[in-house]
Amino acid sequence: MSIKENITQIIRELPSDVKLVAVSKFHPVESIMEAYGAGQRVFAESRPQELAAKVPAMESWLAANGMQNDIVWHFIGHLQTNKLKMVLPYASLVQSVDSLHLLEAIEKWGRDNGKVVAVLLEYHIASEESKQGFSEEEIKGILSDVGRFPHIRFR
């Protein structure tokens, strides 16, 4: 089954209030174009370099074909603070904020750039120490003091 056929079938079966997020990591821009042709509009990347390359490529392709840029990009996976400049100009949602250090760095980027960044906090439910994310207490602390993060929209 082609990408277009697969996405068309999935979208047809989804309730109207559910959005499909297509993870495009490791796929070439041509695959994103095919998915776009099937009606897919929300894409996610987990590698900053890929996001920073694919967004302008898709913007150019849409413009060259006289189409409106209605793609929404998410960032998934672990994000390092030194990669924020590659991700935040493009991602409408960062799905993987896993530390206070990263949250504070995103707040600073938003303040410096006059932007509000939408984020999801990663909740650490595993007992494994190697896993990342916030504890329940940390999340409660952050959410009780959201005024500290005026450039972040918690979703």
Region locations from a protein language model:
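Conserved alpha/beta-domain cores
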Residues: 1-155
